[in-house]
Amino acid sequence: MRFEDVAEILRVVGRAIALGCRDHYDAGQRAAVFASYASVLFVEALGPYEAVVAELEGRIVAYAQLDAATSRLRALFVDAECQGRGVGRALLADVEGRASRRGCARLHGAMSLNAVAFYARAGFRALGGEERLMSASEGVHISVVRMEKRLRA
C-alpha cells in the first residue's frame, strides 16, 4: 500500500461497512466503525502495520492490515460490489502467507458479525461467543467474535 492509496482505501472501507454490515449493525454503529477507521488510517499507513490491497482492473477493491508483531489481522474489507467473487479469500490467503513468513504461528482478530461465516470457511475458529467492544468513535458498542487460525509453518 502506498500513502496515496489512502483515499481509495477509505472508499472501499466505507462501501464495505455501509453495505456489507447493514444486516448486523445499525446506522450509528456503522458510522462509528467507519469514523474509527478513517481517523487512524492515515497514521496507520505510516505505522508499523503491514497494509495490503487487492486490485481489479487497476482499481483498489479490497484492503487488509496485518500486525505481525501480535499476529493480529487488524482489518480486512472488500468493496461491497466485489464481495462473493473470491477477492476476500485471495487477500486473506496473501495475508496468511505474509504472517507465516514473519514467524506468526497463528492469526487472530475481532471479527465483525457479518464476516464470521467467511472466516469460519477459511479455517478460523471462534474463541468464544459474541462480545461487545467500544468503538473509538463516540462510545458506540460493536458486537464482534474473536477468532483465530493456526498457520502452517
Question: Model-predicted segments: where are they?
Answer:
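Short secondary-structure boundary/hinge segments and terminal tails
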Residues: S100, A117, A136-E138
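Short coil/turn motifs at beta-sheet boundaries
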Residues: D5, R102, E138-I142
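Small/polar loops that bind or transfer phosphate-bearing groups
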Residues: M1, A110-M111
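Flexible nucleotide-binding loop
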Residues: R85
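Acetyl-CoA-dependent GNAT
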Residues: F3-E4, R11-E81, L92-D94, R98, ...
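Conserved active-site tyrosine of GNAT-family acetyltransferases
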Residues: Y119, F124
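Conserved catalytic-core motifs of GNAT/GCN5-like acyltransferases
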Residues: H108-A110, R125-R146
